[in-house]
Structures are given as C-alpha cells and as structure tokens.
C-alpha cells in the first residue's frame, strides 16, 4: 500500500448514506462568510455519481425560480455536514443528463419502493 493510499483512507467518511442516480437528496453544506459559518441546504435530484475513493463526486440538479441549477459535491468533503435521502428514484440509467432538456411533468422520476 502506497503512502498516498494511507492518507486517502484516513480522510474517507463513513457517515455517507447509500444513494445513486435518481434519488432526491438534501445536502447540508457549511458556508463560511467572514468569521461566521452557517448551513445551507441544497435539495435536488442526483444526476450522476462518478469516480471512487477520496475523489468520488456527485452532481445534484434542481430548478430554482425556473432556472436549472446543478452543483457538484465531493462525497468525502469536510464542507458537507450531512446528506439526507428524501426519496429513491426508479431510473434505468447511471447518468441522467436527459433531465436537462425536460420541463415540468416530463422531468418527474418514479419512486422506487
């Protein structure tokens, strides 16, 4: 095992819930403004999850005031306070880029039971 692998293993988080593309999440992100810090909640649908280990990331998409907003988070980032899984989506793809063109009811995802 290389030295870098040991450093990476020490920084992996173990409090991340199981989720995949199509799931709706609440991501509580620590935002530091000057000397104050607060939590900001970003709620949306996971459209992709890629890489593995310490470099693993996921992208969440939501529509805010009619504008599509996507944000990519590192899974093991210390800036993420917690992740809540709100619903599990039933999808047949690992990357849901087609949701970018969908509007309204066409962008809905069925819930997995």
From Swiss-Prot:
Pfam families: Ribosomal_L19. Keywords: Ribonucleoprotein, Ribosomal protein. The keyword Zinc does not apply. GO terms for cellular component: cytosolic large ribosomal subunit. GO terms for biological process: translation. It comes from the Bacteria. Gene3D superfamilies: 2.30.30.790. Disulfide bonds: none annotated. GO terms for molecular function: structural constituent of ribosome. NCBIfam families: rplS_bact. This protein is located at the 30S-50S ribosomal subunit interface and may play a role in the structure and function of the aminoacyl-tRNA binding site. Belongs to the bacterial ribosomal protein bL19 family. HAMAP family: Ribosomal_bL19. PANTHER family: LARGE RIBOSOMAL SUBUNIT PROTEIN BL19M (PTHR15680:SF9), RIBOSOMAL PROTEIN L19 (PTHR15680). This is Large ribosomal subunit protein bL19.
């Amino acid at each position: 095992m290389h030295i870098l692998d040991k450093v990476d293993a020490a920084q992996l988080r173990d409090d991340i819930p199981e989720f995949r593309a199509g799931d709706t999440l609440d991501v509580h992100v620590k935002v530091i403004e000057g000397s104050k810090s607060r939590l900001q909640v970003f709620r949306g649908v996971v459209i992709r999850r890629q890489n593995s280990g310490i470099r693993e990331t996921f992208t969440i998409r939501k529509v805010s005031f009619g504008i599509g907003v996507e944000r990519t988070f590192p899974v093991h980032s210390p800036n993420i306070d917690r992740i809540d899984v709100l619903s599990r989506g039933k999808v047949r793809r690992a990357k849901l880029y087609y949701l970018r063109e969908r509007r309204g009811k066409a962008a809905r995802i069925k819930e997995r039971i």
